[in-house]
From Swiss-Prot:
Keywords: Host cytoplasm, Host nucleus, Secreted, Signal, Virulence. The keyword Ribosomal protein does not apply. Secreted effector that suppresses pattern-triggered immunity (PTI) in plant host. The keyword NADP does not apply. The lineage of its organism: Eukaryota, Sar, Stramenopiles, Oomycota, Peronosporales. It comes from Plasmopara halstedii (Downy mildew of sunflower). This is Secreted RxLR effector protein RXLR-C05. Residues 1-21 form the signal peptide. Residues 37-56 are annotated as: Disordered. Residues 37-46 have a biased composition (Basic and acidic residues). Belongs to the RxLR effector family. Induction: Expression is up-regulated during the early plant infection stages. The gene is RXLR-C05. The RxLR-dEER motif acts to carry the protein into the host cell cytoplasm through binding to cell surface phosphatidylinositol-3-phosphate.
Amino acid sequence: MRGAFYVATAFLIASSTRTAAESVQIKSEITQDLDKLPVGDSDTKSLPRRSLKGSGDRLEIPVAEEERVIPTGVLEGAGKDVSEAILRLEKSGDDLNKMVKVGEGVGSSATSKGKRIQIFQKSHKDAVAEHQQVFDTYKHAIKKNEALELERDTALIKSHNWKLLSDYFSAQAAKDTKNYHNYHTIFSQLDSVVTPATASYKGIKNTREKYLALLEESFSRANAAKHAGNMDEYNEIQVTVAEL
């Protein structure tokens, strides 16, 4: 069964991001423990000694669960969850490594060896589940980050639109202010023209009223002189009115 132990242990070590040195040390310890098994009490038919290369007891390992690189700390807020999942995966590998180093489950009977294989297989399954959980957490973090980026871009677009509106109304307000000053200047200039014209109009009006009053008085005096038979005075008044 050494081939099965080697493959299962090597896969778990790779999944828990162990170094190459640790992998060599563990494989060496597994080989030493198996070489120390008592031969007399063992079932030689069920436990043939095979080379680690080309062992028929090699465990089938899903291709989809091959070693991956965990990009921890990529996303703010999700990095903590990803790190914790990685720590759980490494702890699972540590537990299995400790089990191999201390020789837990190593017995002289086929039953003990079968139990030991079941323990390794369960640890392998748990490690794969932890490994998958890391990527599920990371995918969730990616989606959350994309949603946050979408909200950020939407906010930037709204902010840009508000700035455009603000700039437009600011420019319009500046234009209206300029127009107001222009109109105020024009009205001031018109006032400087209208005021003298108004004064002149009032002067002309007063002169006309005086002229009409003088004519009325002259006609009254002329009629009175004519009725009195004073023709010299009447003629004099006629000459004065003609000169007006």
